[in-house]
Amino acid sequence: MTDARNYLHLLGQGRGAARLENAGAAPGTPPPKPELLDRLQAEIAWVEKKTGVPADADAKRALLGNANEALSRLYGDGGDASLGETELSGLEAVVRADGSRPVLFVEDDFVDLRAPSLGLFAAQLSRVSDAVRDVCRSVGRVDDPSPEATLGYQGTAWVVGDGLVATNFHVLQAIAPGGVRADGRFQGRLKTGVSVHFGHEVGGPLPERRFPIRRVVAVGREGGAGTRHPDFPDLNFGGLDLAILELEPVPGRPFPAPVRVARGDDPVSRGGLATRGRGVYLVGYPGGSTSPDLFASIFAGVRSFKRLAPGAIMASAGEVAHDPKGWVLTHDISTLGGNSGSALVDLDGDGRSVLGLHFAGNHLRENWAHAAERITADLDAALGV
């Protein structure tokens, strides 16, 4: 699917599209351009209200201009529209704001159902609200106090066992520079002061939820030289981008409960949960981006808050190119760099089962995650099960 067709499809799923269907329009018809631009401005105002941080006027003006130009091309040329990075950045902001693929603040372990960008996801999240709260409580930020960590953290982690969290190996590399892995074992030294912080939500302080990282328990095996992705040399789908970390207990501070992980040997689901089109959500700490992202630059100081972002699986494990192990799936959730290590969670089902470990994304096009049901044996081995 081309970029233009993909965004037309997403816009046809948003909140405005639902209103048009009720009025007799064809199913999946995107709403008018003025309505989408109004929704984008409403989302910017909502972020200002929630954070108390005023939007940067120049970045806001540029973003609205990019969105206007992108929508003009998209609606004028349809699925054959030519879209550059500037237009794609504008469209990504639109789908975050119109209910297609929102990025929502987590407050008190849930989202505000009044958020203007929530759209049709409000009903889905309400249905599994207790499960979502449990997941949000068990997702933390991998904090790095060193001067080279410009955002103050390196990624996201989530509780996978008693005192244990899962994240990406490349997140571990950022907090243990020079560390290497061999046969599932890590050799290296953690930076001083690194920790996992299960709070940092918008809307005020919560009880302290920070736990120092004690040690590295296990890491996923490295991929061979022959399995590097031909278009993205830093990616190697033959390797497992996983690290299990043990956290220090803190007196008087309860440790979050482990998140349920879907298993490939489950006798009921039989490894078939993470299918194409299934609704999922991701909880993490979106931070920097390797590509221009004006929506993020509008609010320079608020990128490190805990967020929840819903979406869908684009391709299930076994359908992704250059994946020799058949353990990678793709999804269309809006993500940025700090989301590395996030859990991809079932939204259509129980609202709490981890279906994937997010590890990378091709900005504005697709994101990659290890399918939980395809790494059951590896995860069991890492946890000593």
Tell where the protein language model's regions lie, with residue ranges.
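Protease-domain processing segments flanking chymotrypsin-fold serine proteases, especially trypsin-like
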Residues: 1-155, 308, 312-316
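C-terminal subregion of chymotrypsin/trypsin-like serine protease catalytic domains
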Residues: 2-42, 46, 315-329, 336, ...
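Polar/charged alpha-helical tracts
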Residues: 42-45, 73, 130, 296-303, ...
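Short, solvent-exposed coil/turn linker segments
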Residues: 106, 112, 119-125, 212, ...
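Serine endopeptidase catalytic core focused on the charge-relay Asp
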Residues: 130-147, 151-154, 158-162, 166-337, ...
